[in-house]
Design a protein with these regions (language model features):
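Active-site rim beta-loop-alpha module in soluble metabolic enzymes
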Residues: 126-132
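Metabolite-binding pocket within alpha/beta catalytic cores that recognizes anionic/polar moieties
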Residues: 1-125
Length: 132
């Protein structure tokens, strides 16, 4: 499956879709992913706060969730969110695309890198490719 919906506050199901829960084990812990179909398209549905909204934002295991989606073969994800806006031009229930994002959270991991082999090459081993 190549598509996932990562749902935030207020979205715990998709009308007309039937899902089966799967617990995907990752090196960051288990993640609960619901797998099903929407209009013939197989998708993964991840309720970020849990299906009963029992997981507060600072307790969400983001790394396990993303790694689980990767293990399922997901290539693209649509994420929903329910936050306020500082612009009167974006009233409640608006559909918006985030172009800038500042993450001021603390107390949780912000990377998948845990040391060791990083996949980065020393500069003397790199080549520069330029496009015309």
């Amino acid at each position: 499956m190549e598509t996932a919906i990562i749902a935030g506050t207020g979205i715990y199901a998709i009308p007309g879709a039937e899902f089966q829960e799967q617990v995907i084990e990752t090196e960051y812990g288990p993640a609960l992913i619901n797998v099903g179909r929407i209009e013939g398209q197989e998708i993964a549905f991840l309720a970020r706060h849990g299906l009963q909204h029992t997981v507060p934002p600072h307790k969400i295991n983001y790394r396990a969730n993303i790694r689980a989606l990767q293990k399922l073969g997901v290539k693209r994800a649509l994420a929903t969110f329910a936050v306020g806006s500082i612009s009167r031009g974006v009233p409640p229930q608006s559909v918006a695309v985030v172009s800038d994002f500042l993450d001021f959270t603390s107390g949780r991991e912000h990377t998948f890198f845990n040391g060791g082999e990083s996949g980065l090459a020393p500069l003397d081993e790199c080549s520069v490719v330029t496009a015309p």
